[in-house]
């Protein structure tokens, strides 16, 4: 993490810590001012800064930014040094979780919130608020966030929810739930709505691709045979197509994800930082 200075709401903050951007919303270029988070003394050179760790939830944000063709910069949150728990990072996200996206409107945390904000701001990778399919898209996006991803956290970090001696029992109980979640998502993908379709990437498909990648890999020291991509053929088709996208290739290069990061994933070998 970078050096700290006065907090953004402090009367002692530097009077010139403001950023001015021109960035597109729809077809209109909007100029925006944003007060810089006071924990940083440098200035962003792009309208977005992604605070990330390799192969973490920030991967979904990187993929969306790449697919939208948006300029952004990254700041590593080094998990080996527990930087997500530092005072500097908690100024951006008081929960100490990754990712955070700094924007001209301030920092955003929560993966689904960032994805939805980007999609609506830039009118890409999601149905518009006026579209008839918007309601269906929203319910499945938040299913992916509030149900699927929430249960994945229990699988990955069972010791945070129960005594360590009982962690394997908790994991065993959560796996059938995860299988059911994937089955209902696959049934929805069978109907091929434009926001859950092999030929039309969306913030939801990228989010799901990341989560399914992690199911195949983590926890590294636990049974993972319960997850079989072939059990969900319609989702498998989506993941296969996403691997051909330039956005995915950019993420592979940036985070060392291997040539088939979604359909046959390998552990990340990033140039910086650590996935765990």
Describe the function of each predicted region.
Residues 1-9:
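Ser/Thr-rich, low-complexity intrinsically disordered segments
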Residues 9-18, 40-42:
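Intrinsic-disorder-associated, low-complexity terminal segments enriched in Asp/Asn/His/Tyr and depleted
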Residues 22-32, 36-38:
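Intrinsically disordered, low-complexity segments enriched in serine/proline and basic residues
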Residues 42-172:
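GST-like domain detector, emphasizing the conserved glutathione-binding G-site
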Residues 251:
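Charged phosphate-binding loop/patch that engages nucleotide di/tri-phosphates or the phosphate backbone
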Residues 255-276:
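Acidic/histidine-enriched, glycine/proline-rich intrinsically disordered or flexible terminal extensions
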């Amino acid at each position: 993490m970078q050096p700290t200075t006065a907090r953004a709401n402090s009367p002692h903050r530097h009077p010139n810590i403001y950023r001015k951007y021109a960035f597109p919303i729809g077809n209109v270029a909007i100029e925006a001012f944003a007060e810089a988070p006071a924990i940083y003394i440098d200035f962003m050179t792009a309208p977005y800064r992604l605070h990330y760790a390799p192969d973490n939830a920030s991967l979904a944000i990187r993929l969306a930014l790449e697919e939208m063709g948006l300029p952004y910069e990254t700041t590593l949150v080094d998990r080996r040094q527990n930087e997500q728990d530092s005072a500097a990072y908690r100024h951006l996200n008081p929960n100490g979780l990754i990712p955070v996206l700094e924007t001209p409107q301030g920092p955003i945390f929560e993966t689904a919130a960032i994805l939805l904000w980007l999609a609506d701001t830039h009118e890409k990778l999601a149905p518009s608020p006026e579209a008839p399919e918007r309601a269906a898209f929203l319910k499945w996006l938040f299913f992916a966030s509030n149900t699927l991803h929430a249960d994945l956290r229990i699988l990955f970090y069972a010791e945070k929810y129960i005594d360590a001696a009982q962690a394997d029992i908790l994991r065993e109980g959560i796996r059938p739930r995860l299988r059911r979640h994937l089955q209902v998502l696959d049934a929805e993908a069978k109907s091929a709505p434009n926001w859950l379709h092999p030929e039309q990437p969306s913030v939801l498909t990228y989010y799901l691709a990341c989560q399914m990648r992690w199911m195949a890999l983590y926890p590294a020291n636990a049974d993972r045979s319960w997850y079989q991509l072939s059990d969900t053929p319609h989702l498998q088709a989506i993941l296969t197509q996403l691997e051909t996208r330039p956005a995915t290739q950019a993420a592979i290069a940036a985070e060392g994800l291997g040539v088939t990061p979604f359909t046959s994933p390998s552990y990340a070998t990033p140039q910086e930082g650590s996935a765990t």
